[in-house]
Design a protein with these regions (language model features):
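Conserved glycine-rich Rossmann-like NAD(P)H-binding loop of the short-chain dehydrogenase/reductase
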Residues: 25-41
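Active-site helix of classical SDR
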Residues: 116, 152
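Residue(s) in the substrate-gating loop at a strand-loop-helix junction
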Residues: 136
Length: 225
């Protein structure tokens, strides 16, 4: 059955790989990202009914406008993937500039809340849907020089568990650790060691079937691909 999939952060990395794989399997993707160039390229490659918009999820007004536009022409998403995220430049916490710390919080945590705020009411009204908030191995453990990122991903775990307790029957919210994938984000931390892990495209072949199987019975579960 064809599903409507909402994905944030589709310009690159996991979001882009997921977009391509969902569409390849016949599903409709509603995606957003901050790169005008990449969003235009995706819309050209994957025309309607797929829809791609330039949105900074850290900006609540932009997310509100995006939701209004998307929900005017599409049903509430069957699957909402809060994927967009930033990582701080590797450094001890006391050397991370205040603005950089704020940027990580704004995208990784507030951005997730913004998307939930403007899309989940439509999912509740529809009576079904699954919200997947991307966590990380660093949302269940920690490491040096990524304290801001760890803080946001631990917060996502708690936020999602609380959200799961608030949802009406038929819906689910799950925090997802996608695993270790060779993306630009991982390369910024692991350097050459990132090549030992699967690419985003390889990962998506496993992740998409996994995500499509999620339903209300998974509500509140901590999951890992």
């Amino acid at each position: 059955m064809k599903k409507t999939i909402l994905i944030t952060g589709v310009s690159r990395g996991l979001g882009r790989a997921l977009t391509k794989e969902f569409i390849r399997l016949g599903h409709v993707v509603l995606g957003c990202g901050r790169s005008a160039k990449e969003i235009a390229a995706l819309q050209k490659q994957f025309p309607a009914p797929n829809d791609f918009s330039i949105v900074d999820v850290a900006e609540d007004a932009q997310v509100a406008a995006w939701a209004k536009k998307v929900l005017a022409t599409h049903a509430a998403p069957d699957l909402l993937l809060n994927n967009a995220a930033l990582i701080n430049r590797n450094a001890p916490l006391w050397k991370v500039p205040a603005q950089e710390f704020s940027n990580v919080i704004d995208v990784n945590l507030k951005g997730v809340a913004n998307v939930i705020r403007h899309f989940v009411p439509a999912m509740i009204a529809r009576g079904r849907g699954v919200i997947v908030n991307f966590s990380s191995g660093w949302g269940r453990s920690t490491d040096a020089e990524v304290a801001p990122y760890c803080a946001t991903k631990w917060a996502i775990e708690g936020l999602t568990q609380a959200l799961a307790q608030e949802l009406s029957p038929g819906l689910a919210a799950v925090p997802l650790n996608p695993g270790i994938i060779n993306t630009a984000m991982l390369q910024s931390c692991f350097a050459g060691g990132a090549s030992n892990y699967p690419t985003a495209e390889e990962w998506a072949k496993t992740a998409v079937p996994f995500l499509l199987k999620l339903d209300a019975s998974n509500n509140g579960e901590q999951l890992t691909v």
